[in-house]
């Protein structure tokens, strides 16, 4: 069901998503887990809805619809929160396929909706992909994959994409194969676009867009959420570009290959090549054959189209070339502006029709349009499993030949590159290439001519129909009316014109038949007629489409020209934009630096401006305070008041004297006056406290000056700051000056206070005198008392005024102090911010250094990874060389078969004979097809039987491969050890050959002869001299014989080892030759099969061709199965032989009960030292005796040994199993053995020096399975042998 509204679409897709997740909710994750095509399409549909909603006002609504969908009765939002659990132990919670899909889709949807900055998206995806790696590592689900939507990819830079890629590439334990391939494709695509490739294909919908110059697999398109209904635009130079739109059917079963529909992209722009539906089999992939195959690694059909079962997906390193695109079906591009094509047609089936062949050929095809009221179900050929598609007249076959020619030209180019300038096949390759080019040009010309003729045929056919209708109408008129000669003349003229038109049409038809016969490369009876009938069948279906296409092209030509001009201008603008982007990026970096500096200076300037404003306010307030202080001072310094007080005091004194004289007074009034005087004194003391506050303010100003000096030192490089500091300095000078004025005012206040103190003292004296007067009984007159009260009130008023001025001055100084404190706090805050900014800058510098070091380490890791993959590249090069040699052999076979067309003529004669027999059979059966139908059914039964056999062979092959997995370790081990053995053989060839082997045998024979001679002499000496005098000599000779026997055994073991290596080399070469023969036989069978298929495709019954193809497939699979079985048997035989040789060698060469023989010196035997590859458990060493032995054994025998044996000269290659035997060094001074030196002394001496002279030998076959690197084993276990 097709939905047009976005909200309705989102609702439907959310329900489908919830249903699919419920189905997969209990499927546990494992190595076989994977998403089907239906599940991938459901995920793509819901993510597309979220992406489309980003450009509308419904984005939050679409996301809420998804969140509110229910899974198992619970909303998706709650289920997601339960699974995520704040990122704690996510890998343990996501243990099923349904939970995996829900977790990834909700994460991507939330990221698309809420994140717009690339840094935020990168941080989220880094954490998310680490969780994905943990899940894959725990469950081994390497085939699970839900890629990043294009809406998020477009917001990321390439550096961020590479960092996300490193999350997967560094997690070696996590099996994230498809994620790695996804990011590898993004990297390859980006660097091809950056390199300036003008050939590209662009796909876009809504805010998402993606461009690629190479083929794009379907799983990449699904991950980027693109569909075949999106807008597609391609470069004009891309001629062979195809878009796959749908999976039609599966071959045999779902595990085999499938047949897909594709659309060839002829135009530069499409609004979609298929209809926007929710089909479960919908596919979208881009195949680009116009680019070099060495760049496009996804051209291979196995990589381009993902199989239905995800576990059958193969990686790039495992696939073989597969370009079976001929089996897919081409369909026309969908155009939403045109009417839908007729899909339900009633066509008579070929096996159910009757009548003669001629009647069938002349009978037109009946096309019945389906009506909604019809009760009959229309025939759908795609639902019929026995349906055989009829060959229609299209350019598909020629286009396929065009693809084959392009592929052959590409292969020939590679062969020419491999052959070089002096290759013997160069001339043949050039000739073949020239012929292919000519054939390509001829096909192109014929193809263009056929298209022209087809268009003309359509036009002429329409005209014939139109004229036929007119003729019929004219005949009806002529038969119905007999009056008027003018009308008959007109009719005759019209009929004449129509006959001329018919003649021209016949000539055009004849020319078309000739062209078709020419293309068929021969005159075939009735082929042109049949081709025309088939072309009519096809043209009838596409009649309306072609008419609309012609009209559309006429109307769009000017639009295309305008678009081309716009594209050129856009390219020019793009170049200018790239240049502007680089310039802008440089300017942005510079601007960011300047902005940081400006911000810093702006902060300082703002702080200084605030300080300046505050200082201006302080200056104004200080002026006000100064004016008030001056007034107060003037008031306090008013001498008139002081004189008045003095005169008043004198008057009081006089009156006091009068009172004393008069002897009377008012004691109550005097006491009240005394209390009033004490209050005045208290107020004077409070005024005195202002001086201490002024001194404290002076100290605060000094502290502010010190802090301003510190700020000046921190900003000494800033000229503006210095000027501002200078102004502050001047202001501080003014403040100091004002402070000095205040101090002078305070000094004047101190004088006033001293004067008042003196007056208080005077008043106290007066009070004392008054009290004395009271005691004397004197009184005062009421008049004088009133005057004193009035004066006291005046003094109180003056004191209040002075106190008020002092309080105002105190409040002003207090406010100034608060502002100064606030200024200090602001300066401290600015200083703290500057220090924090310095710390932040240093932190960023450290982070930058750390990131640079990390980049260097990653580059080292990349180089290391390239070094480790060098062997893989070499193997790939060797496989390419093998493929080139196969192609050369195939080319030689083609040349040998190309000289004569006998086979082709024979095939054509056979086809003609089969056709004649078929016609006679049909005529003999009176038009009935019973026999044909019988044989057709028999052929179908045979096909079904062969399919069952093929399925059984597939299962056998699968079981064989599963059984082979058990031996995969041994196979890899054997292959690795083979490589090592080859290296060892190369080293052995430098030191050992047939002559050296013969020399070793000769030395062994000489030593045996010498041993026999010594035994004979010993027996002769024992029989002739049977006394104690020869006991020591006999013992010495026996020990010498024992040592020689040890040397002989070692020499024989060396010879046996060499013989084993030679036998292994022979077997290895035989097996390699056998494998090569098997490969050649298999490739020859494949080539024969391809030629047979090509021969059958030239003509014949479709059932016969299908039967032959099935038989060839069965044979090919049998060959593959036999080859796989032979490989398994060969690996098992080699492994058993290797183990048998190693076990036999160990049991034969080592005796656990054998004790090591003591080493004694013996006379020098001129024999070159021998080396061995086999290892004994306890090797016997010949050790020189101690140097203090001087007496000989007998006068006639003087044994000589090497005092310090030298090591043999080893090759520079340390991986060889054996050493080179060298010529012994010249004899040193001969030490002598004392006759009193007994056996124990010699044995102890040998044991003391044994640790220095013992060398270890190689136990090759025993330890071969335990080591991964034989070079390391040889370096650690082989020590040079000392020469005896």
Curated annotation (Swiss-Prot):
Residues 1211-1221 have a biased composition (Polar residues). GO terms for cellular component: virion component. Residues 340-383, 1169-1234 are annotated as: Disordered. Gene3D superfamilies: 1.10.287.1490, 1.20.58.130. Sequence repeats lie at residues 611-637, 638-665, 666-689, 690-720, 721-751, 752-780, 781-811, 812-842, 843-871, 872-912. It is found in: Virion. One of its GO terms (biological process) is viral process. Pfam families: Pox_A_type_inc. The keyword Oxidoreductase does not apply. Residues 348-357 have a biased composition (Basic and acidic residues). Keywords: Late protein, Repeat, Virion. Residues 1180-1192 have a biased composition (Low complexity). The keyword Ligase does not apply. Residues 611-912 are annotated as: 10 X approximate tandem repeats. Some orthopoxviruses such as cowpox, ectromelia, and raccoonpox viruses, form large cytoplasmic inclusions within which mature virions are embedded by a process called occlusion. In those viruses, A26 bridges mature virion with inclusion bodies through interactions with proteins A25 and A27 on the mature virion membrane. Structural protein that forms a matrix surrounding the mature virion (MV) through interaction with protein A26. Presence of protein A25 in the virion structurally prevents direct virus-cell fusion mechanism. Belongs to the poxviridae A25 protein family. Interacts (via N-terminus) with protein A26. This is A-type inclusion protein A25 homolog. It comes from Cowpox virus (CPV). The gene is ATI.
